[in-house]
Amino acid sequence: MLAARLIILLSFYWLSASAIDPADPLFVDLPHGKIRGRDNGFYYSYESLPYAEPPVGELRFEAPQPYKQQWTDTFDATQPPVTCMQWNQFIFGDNKLAGVEDCLTVSIYKPKNTSQSSFPVVAHMHGGAFMFGEARQNGHENMMREGKLILVKISYRLGPLGFASTGDAGLSGNFGLKDQRLALLWIKQNIASFGGEPENIIVVGHSAGGASVHLQMLREDFAQVAKAGISFGGNAMDPWVIHRSARGRTFELGRIVGCGQASDSMELKNCLKSKPAGEIVSAVHSFLVFAYVPFAPFGPVVESPDAPEAFISQHPVDIIKSGKFAQVPWAVTYNTEDGGYNAAVLLEKQASSGRELIFDLNDHWFDWAPYLLFYRDSMTTIKDMDDYSRKLRQEYLGDRRFSVESYWDLQRLFTDVLYKNATELALDLYRKHGKSPVYAFVYDNPANTGIGQFFAKRTDVHFGTVHGDEYFLIFENLARGPEMRSDEEIISRNFLNMINDFVLSGNGTMTFGNCVLQDNVGSNKLQLLSITKNGCENLQLESFP
């Protein structure tokens, strides 16, 4: 079904070419009608363009349907994209519900660069653990100032609305991933109308956005919608990506919102369709052990082979081993202290006690660690789980207690288990089973302020190079300070040039500054580019440092 839809959608592409009015580039003709964008000084924006029918009512918990409406009046594309409904950890107070259910849009940003008649295209997947976040959480002014690329930001369903699954054909799941897929089809079909080059599309994302890029690339037909992908700080191997116990969690969701009488998946889905969306999303609170842990109670699943329009029906490891995935260039990254994203929240002083949560780990390690590190559902018995918890603590902390002084080793544990080990695993699989180039880099250059300080609400701790420190040099984010150091300005420009050159490369080569990244496919050793404030260096490794 998805392949047939692709053929139908792409057949409209030629109708949309050269649709910008040369007399007024704010107006663009699309198959649905005319739109009006905004002049932002050094770039144009065309925001909140629907790519799917609203996923409400009978379309809730279903694969997205292509947008069908025709506009009789000019569509106002000057409004920023709305937030997809979510339980957002960044909202203070007890009620963290935000957003709306009707949110499936793309937003397009085009630089004013008269020296280019057309532009390569970056399709952007935002992060947020598949639970929260939004298209506008990352800025675009750095990319627009460079003037070389068109940027398209994708909004997709999140949390239970995007990823509830009973593991069978009745309520298959992965609706957020299917949204992303349909958005990529829309971009391929329509981007020429904005001066974009449909033959030069690269998909990038960070964290869950990076994992989304990888999951999209595990479909063999990805090559029909994009030329390459970059997964920053997240990939499909990460333990928080593929969920193993979605069925029980989804039936529990039903019980919480008053659908406990449902005896099968279809009955549960029909009942959930009748409930207010806000009630369903607010139920996320009931799945949290403390604070926002686990940070991803709902997420991607391996669908049943008989599921309608299944996105993936094998585990990512098995897909890669089979060789049946898109053979297009891919890059994957991690930061030296990525785990600070998850660990730093434990350093915030609690209003009730005046001390940090990290001290509570001494009494609750065996209860909390499986949720913090996402192995609760992968262990067969409680004993297996406790043994693994004990092993991790001994390996990283020895006999020391959890405290502010031992934070560095705790974040190292989080970095390894949640990010670094999975990146190494992905590279190892691709070098054995891949055919197109696969690259990797590690970033080690702490921001003055970043996610570590943001979550811990303190600056007296050295957090290192935390999750997002590299990505926010490309796409601005409020979690870090707005100013860049001189070394970060150079790195930012190198990243932007890297993306531009990667998508335009005829043979999939990738460069950063004066360094040429080395291909892992077929290599006897892991090829990893190290990026620091002092430059870049190619490393050949038996295993990651």
From Swiss-Prot:
Keyword flag Kinase: no
Residue positions of the active site: S207, H467
Chief place of localization: secreted
Glycan-bearing residues: N113, N421, N507
EC numbers, comma separated: 3.1.1.1
GO molecular function annotations of the record: carboxylesterase activity
Catalytic activity from the UniProt record: a carboxylic ester + H2O = an alcohol + a carboxylate + H(+)
Pfam families to which the protein is assigned, alphabetical: COesterase (PF00135)
Stored PANTHER family: CARBOXYLIC ESTER HYDROLASE (PTHR43142:SF1)
Family: Belongs to the type-B carboxylesterase/lipase family.
The protein, known as: Esterase-5C
Gene expressing this chain: Est-5C
